[in-house]
Amino acid sequence: MTDQSPAPTAQDENRLIAERRAKLARLRETGVAFPNNFVPDAHAADLHARYDGLDQEALTAAAVTVKVAGRMMLKRVMGKASFATLQDGSGRIQIYLERGTLGEEAYAAFKQWDIGDIIAIEGPVFKTNKGELSVHANSARLLSKSLRPLPDKFHGVADQELRYRQRYVDLIMTDATRRTFEARSKAVGGIRQAMLNAGFLEVETPMLHPIPGGAAAKPFVTHHNALDMQMFLRIAPELYLKRLIVGGFERVFEINRNFRNEGVSPRHNPEFTMMEFYAAYADYRWLMDFTEDLIRQAAIAATGSAVLSYQDRELDLSQPFDRLTICEAILKYAEGYTQAQLDDPAFVRAELRKLGANVEGPPLARAGLGALQLALFEETAEAKLWRPTYIIDYPVEVSPLARASDTRDGITERFELFITGREIANGFSELNDPEDQAERFRAQVEAKDAGDEEAMYFDADYIRALEYGMPPTGGCGIGIDRLVMLLTDSPSIRDVILFPHLRRED
């Protein structure tokens, strides 16, 4: 036996909606169905912080009267007196209402209100006999009628897709969801403040690009009617931010959206938030140190600590991050390989074929040894990088915007940061040689012509900017959504995006 009632059916919900619409119709007849002349002067969390520690005698002596407003989440009518729970943006507070104080008419009106209604209460703060901090209603008003019943407290929003699709209901019902997005805001705020403290200038660059660039990705395409030209939602702000370095801003950053017309998964949303920053006279080693500290600051801002728990495993961001080359990571995390094998293109290609990779199609069909090693790393080692780890020294052929190493042929001064097996950041010493950059763009165009949809276009204006001279520069992009997943112990990227992309409802 159980005392939990079954979840309401669609027929029950339709009946409740009809009843609530009838109540709203009666309110409209009074001429004030949705009043807008009440301003609260207190929030639930503030009341608990100030008065939870006081006893009733002290509260009576303080004689504190407050005005609160929010959504009614619980209602218990007990004859001449009732209790309700009011939920505002900060938390919950109990409300006590009695007929003798409110009067017959106002108390009768309250009894007709429904769970989910937005209400306004004015009265003194007190404690019940059980010690519950409450507001004793001297007046009570209905501010906004809720026509749709909320999920009941026991069943909540059980359908995960419904939580994403109707995030407003999820936020009403689920404390953990609200905490996730509050933590996200704190993390972004912490990053922004750290960047400003380090002397970076926050900028905004175009969201519509005439040429997609700055990343290897498939763009969304649109048309600019006034200019009669094809445009692309930006896949990255990189080339515009580096134009600003050319223009004389020595440290810039941007926190904004990128758009990539690719798959949806627990790690990917086609619309996502990135923080990209560029610093003149910095290289990739400086970037790694700076990024490491920045992520710690974000963790502390969001959670109060740099030591976290993610999916029931400890995640320690307080210690120095590991740094491994692609081959070192394969040798450490994938079993059975030798350096000699990894240096043999035929062997690596055969291994990739065994693992199910399409080595005959783009981009691997034309790949050199470095790109093949990277593909093997992605197949065998990437998911095992639980500890924060920088993978460094990426091959030139997969790093068209990164500066080449002065000491190793075919290698760039580039890193990617992995935490819990996910890429969190990508950075490098920037290529500032315009002739080298033009040649790499041409190689990307050849790859695109050969069928690689994610290869870059040739951006002549960016080359022109480099020809004016760009100082030695380092730049990095941090995936805000994936970082927030770590900081909030969220298994899916959809859990940290307020309104993730979903298929249309039937």
Swiss-Prot record:
Instruction: Enumerate the PROSITE patterns for this protein.
Output: AA_TRNA_LIGASE_II
Q: Which GO terms describe its molecular function?
A: ATP binding; lysine-tRNA ligase activity; magnesium ion binding; tRNA binding
Q: Which reaction does it catalyse?
A: tRNA(Lys) + L-lysine + ATP = L-lysyl-tRNA(Lys) + AMP + diphosphate
Q: What's noted on cofactor binding?
A: Binds 3 Mg(2+) ions per subunit.
Task: Report the EC code(s) recorded for this entry.
Answer: 6.1.1.6
**What are the UniProt keywords, alphabetically?**
Aminoacyl-tRNA synthetase, ATP-binding, Cytoplasm, Ligase, Magnesium, Metal-binding, Nucleotide-binding, Protein biosynthesis
Pfam families recorded:
tRNA-synt_2 (PF00152), tRNA_anti-codon (PF01336)
Q: Where does Mg(2+) 1 bind?
A: E416, E423
Cofactor(s) required, per the database record: Mg(2+)
Q: What class of enzyme is it?
A: ligase
Q: Where in the cell is it found?
A: Cytoplasm
Q: Which HAMAP family match?
A: Lys_tRNA_synth_class2
- What quaternary arrangement does the UniProt entry report? Homodimer.
- Which family, according to UniProt? Belongs to the class-II aminoacyl-tRNA synthetase family.
Identification of the protein by name:
Lysine--tRNA ligase
